[in-house]
């Protein structure tokens, strides 16, 4: 698949989201619930957040994709994630994992490894420190922010992708997406994404929306990041600072067209790391 074909797949995925409005079930953190619900809605999908063990699996059975985000952990939420993830696996529903702060505490790291070991995860999206921690390549995370990444991000992502048969995404100045064989780099985005809380979690939400309609999860993840980054570029043109940028970002995601994605996505293929 060449770059032109990739851009067309990205655009077609956005069009299918708008046409079919897939339900995306989020078991996510308190900090970003409103933002991830809105970004899911604005891209054209339908968000739902059902965290209790009494209904997490049942709700997942209705969804087109499941997000597991460990930003505000508790034992009860981990149990709900496992129940929801098992139902998703049984039903062929893609699971997208956001390992927020993996490496910052033992509990976060152990929870991520437990989820990866017990579930089939379609996509894992994190920053360089989080993915470096989980792959064994190193990396330093303070709170939920990466303060020291890995020397070779594509290689670290590839190790994790091979180990768990998943698509691994490292978001940063350039986004790396790999299934352990194919490697894509997405170059859309804007530095102001680092000034708003939850920008990574919103990226994960969009990956899940794209995965609900695009069965090649490498293409789904790269397409979501290209669309998100393009919306950020457009939003930055009219924003005056972080607060107005956040509002403009949601507006631009809402108004983004498949044609804009086909024309504006900046993606390249790399050799296997």
Swiss-Prot record:
The keyword Transcription regulation does not apply. Pathway: Cofactor biosynthesis; thiamine diphosphate biosynthesis; 4-methyl-5-(2-phosphoethyl)-thiazole from 5-(2-hydroxyethyl)-4-methylthiazole: step 1/1. Signal peptide: none annotated. One of its GO terms (biological process) is thiamine diphosphate biosynthetic process. It holds the Pfam family HK. Keywords: ATP-binding, Kinase, Magnesium, Metal-binding, Nucleotide-binding, Thiamine biosynthesis, Transferase. Disulfide bonds: none annotated. This is Hydroxyethylthiazole kinase.
